[in-house]
Each structure stands twice: as C-alpha cells, then as structure tokens.
Amino acid sequence: MKIYIAPMAGITDYAFRSILKEFNPDLIFTEMVNANLVNMNDVNTFNTLLKRDGDESVQVFGSGKERLVDAFLKLESIGIKHLELNMGCPKTKIIKTGAGSALLPEKENMTDLLETLRSQLSDNTE
C-alpha cells in the first residue's frame, strides 16, 4: 500500500512535512498553490515552494487553461517534478473562482487542458 499525504491548506507547511517524512510516506504534498500567484511570481508562494526537500508534490488550483498551463510550466522550470491539478476542492471560496470542483462539469475543457499539459510538460514531470 502506498501512503500519500494530501495537501492541507494552512497545515502541510515545511515544518509539518519535515515531521511527516519521519514516517516514510511515499509522497507528500505542499499546501495547495494558487496558479494566479505562481504566474505573478508571488514572493510568499515561491518562498513556500522553494522551502522543500525537492521530492514533495505540488497541487495547483486555479481556472483558465492558459493560466493553469503557464503555472505548471513555471513550476516545472524551478525543478518541481510532481504536479497535480486540484479538481475536487469543494470550498466555496475556491469554487467561486471557477477552480477546484467547479472544474468538474467542464469535461471538454478539462480534457483539452489535460492533453495540453501532457504535451507541454517534460516526460520527467509526473
């Protein structure tokens, strides 16, 4: 059985992830990252992302194909090798922005987005 530690906003910060690593999970996620903040080169977002041991996964939330693709490419360019798109967050403040589970009804758009991500990201990025 594989053990993945899911992203938890306000909880899975660097210190918490360091403690969790003692239990040898197969994969640990950073806190969810806003695609818009990644694209704006937000200092706090990048400080969070760069303060990691290198093998953590990053889960991105956002809406809009171009914004999401740009964010994924930027994250890949700073060495993040495991990326995940959040399509399940039910929180109202996330859904209001068209992100999280608000993406689910848009099957055609999501298929196009995922195909674009697959074609533009390196084969080394999971």
How would you label these PLM feature ranges?
Residues 1-4:
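Extreme N-terminal starter segment of soluble prokaryotic enzymes
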Residues 8-78:
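Glycine-rich, positively charged N-terminal anion/phosphate-binding segment
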Residues 12, 64, 90, 100-102:
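Gly/Ser/Thr-rich beta-alpha loop segments that engage phosphate groups in nucleotides
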Residues 27, 82, 126:
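Hydrophobic "anchor" residues on beta-strands that sit immediately upstream
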Residues 30, 82-90:
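Non-cysteine beta-strand/loop elements that form the S-adenosyl-L-methionine
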Residues 46-59, 101-126:
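Alpha-helix-loop-beta-strand connector modules within alpha/beta enzyme cores
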Residues 71-78, 82-83, 112-117:
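Short, charged beta->alpha transition segments
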